[in-house]
Regions:
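A binding-site-centric feature that preferentially detects glycan-recognition modules on secreted/surface proteins
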Residues: 2-121, 125-189
Length: 189
């Protein structure tokens, strides 16, 4: 008997996820003007691994939604669009090196490792700022963002939030973790 791909949803779960994504898409048309749901759904149905990743985004509180369409590659771009940093992805340090450097009081995991396991990428600063043009996010929380290697080599990592109606980018030690800091993911389909 062939081994079943563990990154594939049951038909019931797939239909439930597609329904949630469709409803969110229809409710937030300002995020994706000129994009048609039927084309996205057809691509999703043909991409079991992408659906699995979107389900990971959904079940961890990310509320993924379409935020763009790359006409060159014909890929639809999903970001986590939850009002606050996804609840089930908080209290994480930045990456594996930061996690391994902690001697005690280690967090359960790192943002980079969790994102990789989910099959998504952490938003860059540019992507985070694009997201903030679509609404007001992270008013009470903050989100790790992809950190340039020169900053990371020196032990730092970057995160963003929105306060005083302004998007801020900050630095912190990569090994730090907070109950109000998570990460937002990006997936291309």
């Amino acid at each position: 008997m062939p081994k079943r791909n563990t990154k594939e949803l049951s038909s019931d779960l797939r239909d439930e996820l597609l329904g949630a994504l469709r409803a969110r898409f229809a409710k937030n048309m300002n995020r994706h003007k000129g994009v048609e749901w039927d084309k996205i759904e057809a691509k999703l149905k043909a991409s079991a691994d992408k659906l699995w990743s979107l389900n990971e985004m959904e079940t961890t509180g990310g509320e993924p939604d379409v935020v763009g369409h790359d006409k060159k590659t014909n890929e639809y771009i999903f970001y986590d669009c939850s009002a606050e940093s996804p609840k089930e992805r908080r209290s994480l340090c930045y990456d594996r090196a930061a996690l391994d450097s902690r001697k005690e009081h280690k967090p359960k995991d790192s943002a980079i490792d969790v994102a990789a396991a989910m099959g998504v990428e952490i938003l860059t600063e540019e992507q985070y700022r694009e997201l903030q043009k679509l609404g007001k996010f992270d008013l009470k929380t903050s989100s790790w963002i992809a950190t340039p290697s020169d900053i990371r080599k020196l032990g730092g990592a970057l995160f963003c939030d929105r306060r005083y109606d302004t998007v801020f980018t900050y630095h912190n030690g990569a090994e730090s973790y907070y109950a109000a800091r998570g990460f937002r993911g990006m997936l291309k389909v």
